[in-house]
Amino acid sequence: MQTSPLLESLMEALRCLPGVGPKSAQRMAFQLLQRDRSGGMRLAQSLTRAMSEIGHCADCRTFTEQEHCTICSNPRRQQNGQICVVESPADIHAIEQTGQFGGRYFVLMGHLSPMDGIGPGDIGLDLLEKRLETETISEVILATNPTVEGDATANYIGQMCGQYGVLASRIAHGVPVGGELEMVDGTTLSHSLAGRNPIKY
């Protein structure tokens, strides 16, 4: 079937989004063109502006249109002394929603992966080391993903923190709230048993 070259181009562009295949891209394109052209224009304008204006925070490397993000610019956050290391800006959003962390962040934009040629310099560990050297940091909380690469990255950063006398801690991994033990994988259950907490009366 022959269609408009512009329509084909739109559908192909939409496929760059994660989880969007040919059918999903086609539905999105037809939805915008048939029922929500004003929404499509807003989307195009927001995308164009975001792609051209959003960069990285000079301190934590998260996404921001300023030199320093709002978290790093917050004096109360600066006085906290804690830095939480995460793999992506999306992880910051997830942690912020809990309301349990009042420090600052450092975004790796990935993890160590020698097989893929990703070393310490590729995920900004030189910048993190500079912060350890120049700032007063009381604790580095390692919130990398519970994967082989995430654990290796956390161990590497933990050793680096030790060189500067900075406490490094790893977020706990275990059985999810509301989960059933028989459905939990062995690795997660092992972490849960190793990280068990005493019951206080």
From Swiss-Prot:
Domain Toprim stretches: 81-176
PROSITE patterns: RECR, TOPRIM
Keyword annotations from UniProtKB, A to Z: DNA damage, DNA recombination, DNA repair, Metal-binding, Zinc, Zinc-finger
SUPFAM superfamilies: Recombination protein RecR
Phylogenetic placement of the source organism: Bacteria, Pseudomonadati, Pseudomonadota, Gammaproteobacteria, Enterobacterales
Protein name: Recombination protein RecR
Similarity comment: family membership: Belongs to the RecR family.
Function: May play a role in DNA repair. It seems to be involved in an RecBC-independent recombinational process of DNA repair. It may act with RecF and RecO.
Molecular-function GO term, any one: zinc ion binding
GO BP annotations, alphabetical order: DNA recombination; DNA repair
CDD domains on file: TOPRIM_recR
Superkingdom to which the source organism belongs: Bacteria
Zn finger (C4-type) start-end: 57-72
